[in-house]
Amino acid sequence: MSVELKPASKYERKIFYKEEWNVKDVPDFIRNSLTSREFGFDHYGNGPNDRYKVFVDDLRLKRFIKVKQPFAAYCSVAFYDKPNQRKGWQKSELVFDVDAKDIPIRTCDCAEGEVCEKCLNQAKEIVLMIRDVLSGDFGLTNINLIYSGRGYHVRVLDEDVMDASSELRGDIIQYVTGSKLPDLSNEYGFNDLQPFIIPFGYPKNFTRWSKYTILHLRRSSKLDDVNNQLLRDVLKHRNLLQEDLWGMFRSNIGPIRYKKVMNAISRINMQITDTKVSIDLKRILRLPSTLHSKVSMKSTLIKNIETFDPFDDAVPKFVYERND
């Protein structure tokens, strides 16, 4: 049966937290650090106004959620000495937030603010690329992937990055998402050296992301400083990138126009993740295992991203029991 992504009623929330939710489904990386994290709750659908909560053990967290049956539950990516005051910051997870409704190059026909199976699959593709860069280029290993209900969170707990400043996190985002046009003339002494020629490091990553973005452009896509004719030419010749024929693609577009396109692509790439989330050391994120009440989906720790399907693995039982 198809799954309709509509809000959960108060009764459905009650059923979910009474019959289905289990505190043991909260990931270990959160349960093992409960006393260092701030928790926040949205009880009425107006945002997480109930903040500064701390739980000393699983039992107290379980009791609170079972009784309150919140519209949404969150916990901090930060670790504190005094989480109930958000004081004594120790470190923060490095996080990437990919929301399917905010992908700038969506290939679906969803209305603004809505999501569907197609754009959720696209969000999953993006998360896989982010994970590969984090593990391949940065050598990070403690990478946790979470389905948030309308997208994905990538939560990194390697100690090497958890004490990074907001500024450094911004630089990491630029690298990971290929959102800065490489300036190769200064580094290598050539004025016309193109990133697609260099098969390693950031130039390789930038080329990979640029290819992904260009192949997902549509006629309706809006690119800064790219007019309709140039966009049509990009769409006409982008099949060359399937075979990584960047030189021919650049030649067909023209060097000056090509540079305009690549500058625009880098700015689009910056919008693939929510940068504000990544650089905010005190951000709270949806608590995995809890309900995303706006779409009636479970936020879920993903064990195998390649086989994960939110419409099989993150749908609460009450959704299948609906009569309307």
Curated annotation (Swiss-Prot):
EC number(s) reported in the record: 2.7.7.-
Enzyme class: transferase
Listed cofactors: Mg(2+); Mn(2+)
Active site (catalytic residues): 97, 99, 274
Any one GO biological process: DNA replication, synthesis of primer
Protein origin, superkingdom: Archaea
InterPro entries xrefs: DNA_primase_S, DNA_primase_ssu_euk/arc, DNA_primase_ssu_PriS
One Gene Ontology cellular component: DNA-directed RNA polymerase complex
SUPFAM superfamilies: Prim-pol domain
Keywords assigned: DNA replication, DNA-directed RNA polymerase, Magnesium, Manganese, Metal-binding, Nucleotidyltransferase, Primosome, Transcription, Transferase
Any one Gene Ontology molecular-function term assigned to this protein's record: metal ion binding
A Pfam cross-reference name: DNA_primase_S
Transmembrane segments: none
Subunit structure: Heterodimer of a small subunit (PriS) and a large subunit (PriL).
Biological role: Catalytic subunit of DNA primase, an RNA polymerase that catalyzes the synthesis of short RNA molecules used as primers for DNA polymerase during DNA replication. The small subunit contains the primase catalytic core and has DNA synthesis activity on its own. Binding to the large subunit stabilizes and modulates the activity, increasing the rate of DNA synthesis while decreasing the length of the DNA fragments, and conferring RNA synthesis capability. The DNA polymerase activity may enable DNA primase to also catalyze primer extension after primer synthesis. May also play a role in DNA repair.
Family statement: Belongs to the eukaryotic-type primase small subunit family.
Entry protein name: DNA primase small subunit PriS
Native source organism of the sequence: Methanosphaera stadtmanae (strain ATCC 43021 / DSM 3091 / JCM 11832 / MCB-3)
Organism placement in taxonomy: Archaea, Methanobacteriati, Methanobacteriota, Methanomada group, Methanobacteria
The gene coding this protein: priS
